[in-house]
Amino acid sequence: DTMVSLIEEAGGEALMAVCDEDAAEQVNQIENFIAQQVDAIIIKPADPAETISIALDKAYEANIPVISVDAPPAEDAKYLSAYITDAYDLGYLVGEEIAKQLLEKYPEGEIEYGIIGAIDGNEIASIRNNASRDGIKAVDTEGRIKEVAYLYSGDFSEEGGLQTAENMIVANPNIAAIIGTCDAHIIGATSAAERLERSDILMGAVDGSKTAMEMMKDGRCIVALAWNSPQEVGHAAVSGTIGLLNGEATPQSRTMIIKGVMITPENVDQYYDPDSAF
């Protein structure tokens, strides 16, 4: 909705197509846009990204620039630029903030934490998780914060987060913090912690969704959110596309990184949007 509004405000027309993560359907949609002779195509690549490469090649041959958001297409695909948030930066921000809060809350002794992974083999999830570990190590120079659990939820859902956190908390009664790969994990994990009377557990994740911010505002377990804002990414992608079509500028790089923002209980009101669809 944000991207459509921005395009229309600039005097353009936005043709929407939703593939629901179906790569074959996205190929058909791109080919339809080419047939309609659109001026540019903005996509969020479906998985597997390699599937849509042939359609992107056709767009290139038709002199239609392709701008990607959220994730880049396959490396060999012909696209102009990808506007993305840095998965490592986002994960690092979460680990860094959780470590700061843990060391302040527990000035002495060993502190235990766990990570809820997503899907084994998912590259972005793995990058986020390892970055969170690095963020913790950078702050915890004495090595007091110990990872005691790393469990895959099997998906990016609240239910997966709830079940995984429940197992994690029961098996590790002294756990002081849980880091999720995404907001859904810690939204579910908060329910698990409250059910087990462990609302003292600190939680953080990447995304910064409206629901997670509301839970933070209510003083529940969530205390750190690295904001992976689709609005910010979409705004940057549309601005870059409009500038390109108006002959004002081309993207400076094939990969345009949108920096993440750390949201905590202290600044959540600055970023919370009650009307957000995300």
Language model regions located:
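A residue-level marker of the well-folded mature domains of exported/periplasmic proteins
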Residues: 1-278
